[in-house]
Design a protein with these regions (language model features):
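Non-heme di-metal
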Residues: 1-252
């Protein structure tokens, strides 16, 4: 599939290509692809919203995610690499399909759970960690985008808490059902080994074994993402003994 963003749309002065540039290229590619999937998700969400304010909010989020993707592409150019994106890559396509099943059911709450609670928890935690170790403006960009994504989670919490207050058992069952679908895919994506083959985003071999060279690891990113996810579920009021069991059953 052709990339959704023109990676050569503007001329930015590049720094010299460092030995770690190919690693950051793949990290950026995963992040950029995730942002474009999020933009597609929010655009689809706008189409099922009845409230004009909700439509405008979803479209604003979509524009923000496209801006994040463009920022990641720009950071790649600064270090002399082209950042690819592939929203049809194996895992990202599955995540997109999970969201679109909620769209097909016109399940607004389900859409919020998938995008704002599950996918955004992953983004906030992983971007925050990358932001701490990536050099210069690359780290600053990841940290800044993590902070913006955190606002998306905060925005959804009031809506979802109100929904849970109507029927906690029904709400928790919905979250668990979506967890089995979406979080299983995310867990596989962050597993130590890609047991299902190449992820179709990394430009060469899987980047995960090389993450140690830039003070990262797949296990660390997975752990941070799951901790953020559990914290978010706790903020919703879902019992911790239940959510810990859910996470313990995810593939490793």
């Amino acid at each position: 599939m052709e990339p959704l963003i023109d990676l050569n749309c503007s001329a930015i002065e590049c720094t010299s290509l460092s030995p770690s540039a190919p690693i950051w290229q793949d990290v950026l590619a995963q992040a950029m692809t995730g942002e474009l999937v999020a933009a597609m998700n929010y655009t689809a969400l706008a189409e099922i919203c009845d409230d004009p304010a909700e439509v405008a909010d979803a479209l604003e989020h979509a524009a923000g995610e496209r801006g994040h993707a463009a920022a990641f592409a720009a950071e790649g150019r600064k270090i002399g690499v082209e950042v690819s994106n592939n929203v049809d890559a194996k895992y990202w396509k599955r995540l997109r399909e999970s969201f679109m099943r909620c769209i097909a059911d016109r399940d607004f709450i389900g859409c919020l759970i998938v995008q704002e609670i599950m996918l955004e928890s992953f983004a906030v935690a992983s971007y925050s960690r990358v932001g701490k170790v990536a050099p210069g403006s690359l780290g600053q960009t990841f940290a800044a985008i993590a902070a913006e994504e955190e606002e998306h989670v905060d925005h959804a919490m009031a809506i979802l808490r109100a929904e849970r207050a109507l029927n906690a058992q029904r709400f928790d069952e919905k979250v668990h059902r979506l967890h089995l679908d979406v979080m299983t895919t995310l867990a596989k994506m962050l597993a130590k080994e890609c047991k299902d083959g190449h992820c179709e985003v990394c430009h060469g071999n899987c980047v995960k074994p090389s993450l140690f060279d830039v003070s990262l690891s797949a296990a660390e990113l997975r752990g941070a993402s799951l901790q953020k996810y559990l914290k978010t579920l706790d903020m919703l009021g879902i019992p911790g003994e239940a959510t810990l069991a859910w996470v313990a059953q995810l593939p490793v």
